[in-house]
């Protein structure tokens, strides 16, 4: 495993957790523990033209594939390197036209199958954990999850049968189940979705809600850096989920996606839960039952909004955000994470509608509580400072813009490393204003 020492890490059996990763040497905050090239990856459809399909570089003036006119590259080298994967989709996209719509999971799984055929031996991404060793949790899948896998398998056959040989159906069920609980989403500095990938050695790490490392991306390379001091013999933990929410919500999410309940210090003590579900200070305080009902309402509206994003207009979405905040504010403080969730969604809609002032107003309300609820070095907090900084700059408030961007840089220097291209880009934004 590549590291800035001599390995300094080992795979071990973690009590009650199965396999895990353990430090053999000390790591300071900001140290790179290791990096892992993607075993297989795919750029999300919405980012085509903004990023190179092969190296994920973000730049103007990418060249498009002459055959399908859908894939974009830095140059001929990137295009040539990407061909073994792009050929799975190039002519099918032309043939199917508008009807070409495999999910990102299906696209990624097709690439894993192609990779296994091209490179059957162990790859540099699998120094400590091989793809074939991935946990699938097959025995824990309910009928709904099994049905989703079956429809993915059908889509795989439908869109990829011309260029791929498939294993038997049982093996495909296992592979999709493995991808579902070991896949990663690659995000940019504002946490916008760029694509999906498999990083086997990164998948070896177990989860904690107080993680001691953070995973970031440099193109299609995953990098793992310490966000707490790590001593020799200590297990290395990342977080699989968004840490904003209270313990019960986090564990519902972990059970649903990864089939375990977390027993980290945060989940055992529930130290942050009271502040996360902050109740409005009223002369006549809300009763326990009213609080319970409002939490239930909040969870439902979060789910309703998630579904509504796929078919409702921006103004309808904004209305859901505003009405739900109004209703919740009878019981919840503005710093309550359920309020923050809807503010964050509203900010996203404002950004989409290019209502910069509206987005800024929401961002200003979100940033302080975010800094309190999230761990010290958090990509969620960094990306919020970054969005705020860019909004201020765009609205000609240079002083506030620079302050916010520097806050983002301070977190990113630890999480992404001081030499990350994102940091040079942000410094450039400060200089050029």
Swiss-Prot record:
GO annotations of cellular component type: cytoplasm; cytosol; nucleus
Coiled coil: none
Keyword field contains Transcription regulation: yes
CDD domains: SET_SMYD2
Gene3D superfamilies (alphabetical): 1.10.220.160, 1.25.40.970, 6.10.140.2220, SET domain (2.170.270.10), Tetratricopeptide repeat domain (1.25.40.10)
Record keywords, A-Z: Chromatin regulator, Cytoplasm, Metal-binding, Methyltransferase, Nucleus, S-adenosyl-L-methionine, Transcription, Transcription regulation, Transferase, Zinc, Zinc-finger
Residues noted as binding S-adenosyl-L-methionine in the record, renumbered to the chain: 17-19, 137, 206-207, 258-260
Record-given protein name: N-lysine methyltransferase SMYD2
Species name: Sus scrofa
